[in-house]
Amino acid sequence: MNYYGGKELAESFRTVRKNTLAIAQDIPEDKYDFRPMPETRSVGELLAHIAISNGFQKKIHAEERLNTLAGFDFPSLMKRLSAEENTPRTKVQMIELLTKDGEAWAKWLEGLDDNFLGEVVTMPPTGTPPARTRFDMILSVKEHEMHHRGQLMLIERMLGIVPHLTRRMQERFAASAAKK
């Protein structure tokens, strides 16, 4: 028995996506083109990457239920996902994409059972490690989003925006201090 199954994956992913959406809403649309360095993704590009990049795991587990990645056509999938990421979007469209895609992914996660999550997927011949469980691979979607959300929070600071989670913490501290 797993203590962390499909329902828990879905709920934790929804929490992560809710926080990503808060950042997407807090950053003004005229700053979506901001990039900290020329060779980095802009705010809009990071948000698009977050919204689209789970397409890799979706293809492997939800659409094709592959048990091996040997022979998988990575270049074709990456080309398609890259084209989707590079589609120009307004702030409203980006928030809609993050919302719609996030909820569709979470609903799929909710239906996963322990047997499915425990299945092993063999990596390509040069893959390290040579095999991973579906649970590990699917969990990486949330980990990947949190990685990029950390970048977005630093960008918020560069833009003079206090991240929403920091604002909440400051409000709690201020309320606690006011009671003393």
Regions found by a protein language model. Give the residues of each.
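Short, helix-capping/interhelical loops that line the mouth of catalytic, cofactor-
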Residues: 1-8, 53-130, 159-180
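His/Met- and acidic-residue-enriched segments that coordinate or traffic transition-metal cofactors
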Residues: 1-6, 10, 21-27
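Alpha-helical transition-metal enzyme core signature, strongest for iron centers
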Residues: 13-20, 43-58, 95-105, 138-152
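Surface-exposed patches in mature extracellular/periplasmic domains of secreted proteins
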Residues: 33-36
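Conserved functional hotspot residues or short segments at active or partner-binding sites
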Residues: 39
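Short alpha-helical transmembrane interface motifs in multi-pass membrane proteins
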Residues: 134-136
